[in-house]
């Protein structure tokens, strides 16, 4: 999945070992899995060349997507186009 982080979310992620995000719509910090129990445990992370993006490798305690899919990236472009026809 792709999510947003602010400094607080990054700090909480690094200090707890669980993936936290900043919700742009709710304007608040959230712990991934807080409601579903599908927590994301940090295994390692990398920072990009500009130090403005991070990539986390996680162990997932369940599906990541709110649809119940293991990943949010489960649809192909063709499926998306055909579903709108």
From Swiss-Prot:
Q: Where in the cell is it found?
A: Cytoplasm
Q: Does the keyword Cytoplasm apply?
A: yes
Q: Which InterPro entries match?
A: PRib_AMP_CycHydrolase_dom (IPR002496), PRib_AMP_CycHydrolase_sf (IPR038019)
Cofactor binding mode, per the note? Binds 1 Mg(2+) ion per subunit.
Any GO BP annotation: L-histidine biosynthetic process
Q: Report the EC code(s) recorded for this entry.
A: 3.5.4.19
Which Pfam families did the record assign? PRA-CH
Task: Give the CC-aspect GO terms.
Answer: cytoplasm
Gene3D superfamilies registered for this protein in UniProt: Phosphoribosyl-AMP cyclohydrolase
Under which pathway is this protein filed? Amino-acid biosynthesis; L-histidine biosynthesis; L-histidine from 5-phospho-alpha-D-ribose 1-diphosphate: step 3/9
**Named cofactor requirement(s):** Mg(2+); Zn(2+)
Q: Extract one GO molecular function annotation from the record.
A: metal ion binding
**Top class in the EC scheme:** hydrolase
Quaternary data: Homodimer.
Q: What does this protein do?
A: Catalyzes the hydrolysis of the adenine ring of phosphoribosyl-AMP.
Quote the protein name from its UniProt record: Phosphoribosyl-AMP cyclohydrolase
Q: Which organism is it from?
A: Saccharolobus solfataricus (strain ATCC 35092 / DSM 1617 / JCM 11322 / P2) (Sulfolobus solfataricus)
């Amino acid at each position: 999945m792709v999510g947003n982080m602010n400094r607080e979310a990054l700090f909480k992620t690094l200090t707890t070992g669980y993936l936290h995000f900043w919700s742009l719509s709710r304007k608040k910090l959230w712990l991934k899995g807080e409601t579903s129990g599908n927590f994301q445990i940090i295994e390692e992370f990398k920072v990009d060349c500009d130090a403005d993006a991070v990539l986390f490798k996680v162990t997932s305690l369940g599906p990541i997507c709110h649809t119940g899919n293991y990943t949010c990236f489960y649809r192909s472009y063709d499926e998306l186009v055909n579903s709108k026809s």
